[in-house]
Amino acid sequence: MTKDNMALYMRVLELFRRTSWRMFSSSSSSGVRLRILPSSSCFFDESVQIKVSGLSPGEHVELQAKHKDDKGVVFKASATYQADGQGDVDLNHHPSRGGSYTGVEPMGLFWSMMPESPHKKLLKKDASGPVLVHIEAHRDGQILSQETNERRFMADGMKRVPVNEGRLRGTLFIPPGEGPFLEL
């Protein structure tokens, strides 16, 4: 193989390597990062902060939230944001410019979720499992980054005991540890 052919071969190989890497890389290969703070796992009634970084300054990005309940009903919300001068979007400070809601709404992607099928209500049959909300950052229909927020109703180690005595029906929740425990 001549020196010129070898150089051409190396350029083609490098081009193929770059192209195939883009074709098969994960959705976050764009350098865009979606984060849920302080953690992607929290209690159902806790607020989280959603941040997107790695965008171009002024770039528009659509955030989508999706949850499938225990009956298989899909709930969705979306909002369009414009990145600041550093290429960041922070739902605590930046306004949604359209979608399921507008304005500064830190938890807007959660409270504005609507069922795909009209007149359906969110159903959670078992409080021991989390509600999973999948959040994606999109540009022109392409997923740039994604994260799942696990929203729990019960602390780890909590025991759930069904009560069915005579006419009494209910559920007893027992926290981990020795006690004594508060009564309600």
Regions found by a protein language model. Name each.
Residues R18-W21, S29-L34, S47-Q49, Y101-P106:
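A generic short-segment signal for beta-strand/edge and adjacent turn/coil regions
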Residues M1-V32:
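N-terminal mitochondrial targeting presequence
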Residues V12-F16, F110, G170, L184:
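Generic detector of bulky aromatic hydrophobic side chains
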Residues R17, M23-S25, L37, L55, ...:
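Aromatic-residue hotspot detector
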Residues A83-P118:
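Extended, solvent-exposed segments with strong compositional bias
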Residues S30-H60, H67, K71-Q86, D90, ...:
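N-terminal cap/lid segment of alpha/beta-hydrolase-fold proteins
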Residues M1-K3, F181-L184:
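Short intrinsically disordered, low-complexity coil segments enriched in acidic
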